[in-house]
UniProtKB/Swiss-Prot annotation:
E.C. numbers: 4.2.1.59, 5.3.3.14
Name of the protein in question: 3-hydroxydecanoyl-[acyl-carrier-protein] dehydratase
Subcellular location: Cytoplasm
Subunit: Homodimer.
MF-aspect GO terms: (3R)-hydroxyacyl-[acyl-carrier-protein] dehydratase activity; trans-2-decenoyl-acyl-carrier-protein isomerase activity
Organism: Yersinia pestis
Keyword Chaperone carried by entry: no
GO cellular component: cytoplasm
Function: Necessary for the introduction of cis unsaturation into fatty acids. Catalyzes the dehydration of (3R)-3-hydroxydecanoyl-ACP to E-(2)-decenoyl-ACP and then its isomerization to Z-(3)-decenoyl-ACP. Can catalyze the dehydratase reaction for beta-hydroxyacyl-ACPs with saturated chain lengths up to 16:0, being most active on intermediate chain length.
Residues forming the catalytic site: 71
Main location: cytoplasm
Amino acid sequence: MVDKRESYTKEDLEASGRGELFGAGGPPLPAGNMLMMDRIVKMIEDGGSHNKGYVEAELDINPDLWFFGCHFIGDPVMPGCLGLDAMWQLVGFYLGWLGGEGKGRALGVGEVKFTGQVLPDAKKVTYRINFKRVIMRKLIMGVADGEVLVDGKVIYTATDLKVGLFKDTNAF
């Protein structure tokens, strides 16, 4: 049985990366530097703009984060693809939270828009995921719209983020 809390700490998310949070069959989050959030502050099954689920997570920003030292030298900015990946990570995490089993794989995105950036002097990135569709049959898949905010301002939007869970990824 999945522990369906409304919030998760960094330690919980790291446990997910080791396969300890959702059990042996549940989808793990990435580990180490590729885990793009420090906490999940809200996770509900019947909320969000489409009433199919909502997730909100946060990443604390400081100038010592690994990507600022290499992207770009003399012009540090968080790569936009990391914000996009964070949204996919949260879609997969939600599927595991619902009891889905398998390894998460991003399946696509409808449209992504960047209207701002994350710089080293920012304090916090917030991710908001609003689920549009969840399939929990032989096919396990989530479809959601997402936003990335920096210090309260929306800077990225994505429509139709798609993640599937696969028990066998060799045929993927």
